[in-house]
UniProtKB/Swiss-Prot annotation:
CDD domains: cupin_PpnP-like. This is Pyrimidine/purine nucleoside phosphorylase. It comes from Pectobacterium carotovorum subsp. carotovorum (strain PC1). It comes from the Bacteria. Its EC number is 2.4.2.1, 2.4.2.2. InterPro entries: Ppnp, RmlC-like_jellyroll, RmlC_Cupin_sf. GO terms for molecular function: guanosine phosphorylase activity; purine-nucleoside phosphorylase activity; thymidine phosphorylase activity; uridine phosphorylase activity. Catalyzes the phosphorolysis of diverse nucleosides, yielding D-ribose 1-phosphate and the respective free bases. Can use uridine, adenosine, guanosine, cytidine, thymidine, inosine and xanthosine as substrates. Also catalyzes the reverse reactions.
Length: 94
């Protein structure tokens, strides 16, 4: 079953799904902007197109992730994103 979600007045949209070999995950697109997301459980985020500038919990500096690059977010935390251009991603819930 697919679950469609929309955040930040429609600037971020995702489709959640569950599949063999991947488990629970979502794919989505973020429009340009700045966002803060909270996590319930650990997440693995992979950029598909575009780029994400990310400030992870406890990190002193922002990091830029481009297509094919992955970052991990601890559960029960918040992380900040700066998005310059429309960017697609895959999020796996660990």
């Amino acid at each position: 079953m697919l679950n469609v979600n929309e955040y930040f007045a429609g600037k971020v949209k995702s489709i959640g799904f569950e599949g063999d070999g991947i488990g629970r995950a979502s794919v989505g697109v973020m429009d340009a902007g700045e966002y803060t997301f909270g996590t319930g459980q650990p997440e693995e985020m992979t950029v598909i197109t575009g780029a994400l500038k990310v400030l992870l919990p406890g990190a002193p500096d922002w990091q830029v992730f481009t297509p094919g690059e992955t970052f991990f977010v601890p559960g029960k935390s918040e992380f900040n994103l700066q998005v310059v251009e429309p960017t697609s991603y895959l999020c796996k819930y660990l």
